[in-house]
Amino acid sequence: MLESVKANFTESIQTMIASLEELPEPIALATQMMVNALINGNKILSCGNGGSAAHAQSFASQMLNRYERERPSLPAIALSTDTSTMTSIANDYSYDEVFSKQVRALGQTGDILLAISPNGASRSVISAMEAALSRDMTIVALTGLDGGEMAGLLGPNDVEIRVPSSRAVRIHEVHLLVIHNLCEGVDDCLFPETSQE
């Protein structure tokens, strides 16, 4: 048991170190894209399934409420929170459309879709990306493995933050850290703290 726990910590640390080597640039780019969108009066929609839905909701709540400092609310919507909408879409159409129909209704040109899937193959998230592209939105994709089908949908104005791991649990761990970096970066750019001297 103890060896298993230690092995999990070791693997997690190794994945974080590998991510440190590969992810700062796409994270910084995604942060700047979000800042620009918010300055221009746009919003950020976020989606994912399972643990990724929790990450999408965490991101939106930290935009709407706050991350670590007091500041005005920022416009963000997690598409996985309205169970009535999601279940009616899944029942009447298909689960694949639970996010895409919301993107078509809520998304506007200049908005950002934060699309989260550890393997880049979640059909409902891919459909949301396709809907976002049809609405002339920009996409920030949080993926892992080889990026899956999601990576193939991205254009030159989009950004992929791909965790260098093949294990979903490790990818989820890094995705949460990425989301915290995005939130902190947005706050730093829009609401810089002034030093008290």
From Swiss-Prot:
One of its GO terms (biological process) is carbohydrate metabolic process. Catalyzes the isomerization of sedoheptulose 7-phosphate in D-glycero-D-manno-heptose 7-phosphate. GO terms for cellular component: cytoplasm. Its main location: cytoplasm. This is Phosphoheptose isomerase. The reaction produces a racemic mixture of D-glycero-alpha-D-manno-heptose 7-phosphate and D-glycero-beta-D-manno-heptose 7-phosphate. The keyword DNA repair does not apply. Belongs to the SIS family. GmhA subfamily. One of its GO terms (molecular function) is zinc ion binding. It is found in: Cytoplasm. Signal peptide: none annotated. HAMAP family: GmhA. Keywords: Carbohydrate metabolism, Cytoplasm, Isomerase, Metal-binding, Zinc.
